[in-house]
Amino acid sequence: MGHPDAITLHFPEFVRVAGEVLQGHIDLDLGAAGEDKIDEVHIKLRGSIVTRITEYENKPGEGTQTHYKTETLVRVDQVLWDQKNAPPNLPQVIQCPFQLPLPTGLPPSFHFSHHNRAVTISYAIEVVGHRHGILHANRRVRKVFPVVPPGDLAATAALSQGWRGPWRPYRVQDKIRHGIFGDHSEATMEFVVPELPTFPMGVGFPFALHIWTKTKPVHQEDLESKHGKLFPAPPESASEVEVKLKRRGRLHVYFQSEDIDENIQLRGSLGDSAALANIRTTFDQPTFTPLPDGHNKGVWNRGVHFEGFLTLPEAPTYSTKTVEWHYILEVKMDFPGLGNILKFEVPIHINSGVACPPLPQAPYQYNVPYTYPLPGGPPPMMNLPPSYWSGEHHNWDEVNGE
């Protein structure tokens, strides 16, 4: 990227909020800069939406056609140092502070890539050491960072203090049977979450997952210990319940559009087989309900309950003319037999859950460790793929010769 000692960028690494002022500084080694023929140092703030859709022709041999679109979200340039206008007798290493304003209304950082389509909403600051001479490439030090819009603070506070509000249940019930013939059994699944219009990213919210089963009519003496597992048996572990977070949406490039549809791996609770210890599991005592005129027959009622917290550190739900996405939590229980599946989808709206920091009230102090200006600390880190941080699918300035 450049001379290893000429330019050092100091910019705290955490999620930024649209509307805040970014602060940091560079250390510029004047001796190393002179050896590297650097005569000016600029800093750039960039944000953009870059989309790509590739069309595959139906007829053999016609090839493909790829459509690209870049939408600029923020573009700020500042000169940090100019050799011509620099005062004399400077120390070997100087500090150049900077302040870069993020506009309000920015969409959150986002990255999605499939074999024929991709979209990236990215933000970065870049320090450019301009070198005189047509054969000397400019030196660049870049740092990619994530951005979120301000979110709902009330939900964050309510969840952080322990949810005491109303709950919203999602419930499905069906008749099932183990074989092709015979009486049906019954299974019920219910998922309960706080009744909130939106959930803050990175803040755990409580859930309860209940599964109840009723056997087909059997004799009361048909106990599990004597006749094996009566059908349907509730799951013994949360790992038997399939829970997925799905991101769905659509991206547009001029007159072309494609779907966004991907599964996101959940961590730390439901949907993560390595986190079963974080889920509280309780079983109901089996009860027998006699059937009226059932000739000593009835049904066995059993149930299991899973309780814990879910955290969704994903890019907040958002919609622009270029791209939109939303989330669905899919919960599925597959009992033995053909088609014995209970499933429902829970729409989940995610917001950042954080406020925009206030404007700086004092000059930047490069010799003092940075302290986040809000008591809650910086926003939680988002789940973004390595390709976001590496700059893949970003339309950086040097591609255009800047």
Regions found by a protein language model. Give the residues of each.
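C-terminal beta-sandwich interaction modules and adjacent acidic
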Residues: 1-402
